[in-house]
């Protein structure tokens, strides 16, 4: 048995081509008819007349044959067109029947799960609508989530994208209406599929106000890529920031990249939260892991986190082989062994580093009474807690971001120096405004500068006495700080004593305190540690130049 495959579009095209050929031939025959059917005799004699008549008859016979061929050609073209129409009609009928059969088959397959679970077994989720803005879930076995509805009314957020089942991609989040947030992207399939991108926030319609926040990007399951967060909505007015960018979605647990945060704010500023009075923190995403609370520490250089902050053991494996292995510690009584990996750090609002060094703690050992007691207390509540997690968890911190260019370590580099463009020039710690700003120094002049960050020389007055030069560390993560005993002339902190700190013997005063209100720890030797106090009431900018030394810039010296 033979099979014939016909493409109606090709038949229609062929019929048109054949018709064009026929038209060309008819035109040529018509042009030649006059000169071939009525020839003039070459002379007045009988022979010339007979020859002319003979050739004229040939022309007339050719025209008769051409007319018959033209009629056949027209019939052939009509047959082609008729066949094309017949095949097209048959194809449409079959397609309709197949669609009906497919619909009926899917209906039969999906009916049990829709009845029991409210979602199909196979098929894409429906897109969101004005009355039901969230996209529908994809089929439990196969199917993409529906896209969220993009709102147009003021104050109405975008719909969330639907999530996939076993295999499929998450739906995109819908755009927010004016002054409203975008919808979250749907999650990709549990086995395979990508997350849906977060919806953009709506633009502000209120003068001087930022737009809506971007939606969170959808996460992947085992295999797939997490999606980027949605962009924050545009602000209303010149110089007005966008809304906050949405967070990126987690990548596949076994394979796949992670999404990054959407553009937001002014593209260089993130919130700075002060916890427990002395701990300046930001929220960052390392290696696409969970959002972590990170201490901003001018007293060290390099980012130190636990495995949980990079996505657990699977996150560690995603980063590949470490580039180094070393040991470091904190003065509060904690030593740790860490491996250095290369990955990105996402501070939010689209502020993401290039691949940079990140230190992941493999083993930690408490050595001080505080660190030991804190660890055992945490261990009773959670047997999986490590000494590192307990040490910083006591103050609500997950890791430490060292930003001091001439700090001792742990290194090997400062992640904020891997930010793109001019964002890598320095960082402003603005505790009064609750902001961390990346890039060139935004502080208005005049400012007071101290060469070195964090290690420099400061001058200390005790109750208005002669300034004493003291090697110091300007340490935002130093809590209440330390002071050498030789500076105060005692091994214990005297009560009701006024202590002032200056840039030079006759220079500007940077900060001051009374020992009844602020009590640094007295040490027998070593550097004076300012603790957080200089940062508490004034913005302080850490300039990464000169290279390897840095400059500390105070906006409003006390």
UniProtKB/Swiss-Prot annotation:
Q: How is it modified after translation?
A: Undergoes auto-proteolytic processing.
Gene Ontology CC terms: cell surface; extracellular region
Q: What is this protein called?
A: PE cleavage protein A
Per the record, the similarity remark reads: Belongs to the mycobacterial PE family. PGRS subfamily.
Summarizing the function annotation, the protein's role is: Aspartic protease that processes the lipase LipY and other PE_PGRS proteins. Can also cleave itself.
Which Gene Ontology BP terms does the record give?
proteolysis
Localisation per UniProt entry: Secreted; Cell surface
Listed A to Z, the keywords are: Aspartyl protease, Hydrolase, Protease, Secreted
The protein's organism comes out as: Mycobacterium tuberculosis (strain CDC 1551 / Oshkosh)
Protein encoded by which gene: pecA
- Does the keyword section mention Hydrolase? yes
Residue limits of the PE domain?
1-93
Q: Which GO terms describe its molecular function?
A: aspartic-type endopeptidase activity
InterPro entries xrefs: PE-PGRS_N, PecA_C, Peptidase_aspartic_dom_sf, PGRS_rpt
The residues annotated as the active site are: 297
**Gene3D superfamilies recorded for this chain?**
Acid Proteases, HP0062-like domain
Entries under NCBIfam families matching the protein: PE_process_PecA (NF038019)
